[in-house]
Amino acid sequence: MTTFTRRGLMALLLTLSAGLHAQTPANPQVKFVTSAGEFVVELAADTAPNTVENFLGYVKSGHYTGTVFHRVINNFMIQGGGYDAKYQEKSTKAPIKHEGVEAKAKGGLRNTMGTLAMARTNNPHSASAQFFINVKDNDFLDHQAPSGQGWGYVAFGKVVSGMDVINKIKQTPTGPGGPFPTDVPQTQVLIQSATLVK
């Protein structure tokens, strides 16, 4: 083997090795510390890679620190990640493409109790930073077809510890708050930090 070929092969191996280390782990975990307690979510990067990458970008930038759970509906879900403690909407990156078709084809997570999904508007490709955690099985939110209500919501993670904290949050009395007429916790639930732990 010539010196040139050896050097080329070594460079290729180093490049591939560096690329492997830069990839997101198959199941990264994020720890949330809130005013109601701590919980950890495990993300499904294998079935919803773009959604997970987007979410981790917000985690790593510190976006979620200082945001609140602004929408809490017992027997449905708790939603946060978009508003600060004064109910001012935080700026976000461009929205991401809905990944429901791909996630479903890969046997991805469904909207069952304890799963994490991206919130969005009526536009299926409008998810950015806001997320919700299902507090019951909400199969009607699952992706069915790429049209109308069939788009559903992409579940991309699940709570692996601290479900008692989620259950505590879901039982918080709600009412009006900021620009919202209903469903706002009357005792504010603040996200103090969100950090990648695995």
Please give the residue ranges for each predicted region:
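Cyclophilin-like peptidyl-prolyl cis-trans isomerases
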Residues: T2-F4, L13, L20-K198
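Conserved phosphate/oxyanion-binding catalytic-loop motifs
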Residues: L9
